[in-house]
């Protein structure tokens, strides 16, 4: 236990909590411009071509964002919205692209879990 004099000389430092999504600046989403859209391969033991985009955010950060769902319409200079959420088998990918927002179209023909992919309700 510290004495009063010790605390006067050097006060207690507040706890600093580390964030998993530093580029969001404590915001729920951020807007950015795609600088590169490409596919990459996951870690062992998985095998696929995962679609990702390199994004320059409005706050100056440059991050890699995963593009979920089947098919997408993104290309260089597309303006997209990103949210937090890492992809476990892609090292360095800590953000997800929000489908159906800004320049990113929703997943067409999506029937279940539509809200996560920006898909409208089908006409019965």
From Swiss-Prot:
Gene Ontology CC terms: small ribosomal subunit
CDD domains: Ribosomal_S12 (cd03368)
GO biological process, one term: translation
GO MF annotation list: rRNA binding; structural constituent of ribosome; tRNA binding
Keyword Aminoacyl-tRNA synthetase: no
Listed PROSITE patterns: RIBOSOMAL_S12
Keyword RNA-binding attributed: yes
Keywords annotated in UniProt: Methylation, Ribonucleoprotein, Ribosomal protein, RNA-binding, rRNA-binding, tRNA-binding
3-methylthioaspartic acid: modified positions: 89
Coiled coil: none
Annotated family: Belongs to the universal ribosomal protein uS12 family.
Function: With S4 and S5 plays an important role in translational accuracy.
Subunit structure: Part of the 30S ribosomal subunit. Contacts proteins S8 and S17. May interact with IF1 in the 30S initiation complex.
Name of protein: Small ribosomal subunit protein uS12
């Amino acid at each position: 236990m510290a004495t009063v004099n010790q605390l006067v000389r050097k006060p207690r430092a507040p706890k600093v909590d580390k964030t998993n999504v530093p580029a969001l600046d404590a915001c729920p989403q951020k807007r950015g411009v795609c600088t590169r859209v490409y596919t990459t391969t996951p870690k062992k033991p998985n095998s696929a071509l995962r679609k990702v985009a390199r994004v320059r955010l409005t706050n100056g950060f440059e991050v890699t964002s995963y593009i979920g769902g089947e098919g997408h319409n993104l290309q260089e200079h597309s303006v997209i919205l990103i949210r937090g959420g890492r992809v476990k088998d892609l090292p360095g990918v800590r953000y997800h692209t929000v489908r159906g927002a800004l320049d990113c179209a929703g997943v067409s023909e999506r029937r279940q879990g539509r809200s996560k992919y920006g898909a409208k309700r089908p006409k019965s």
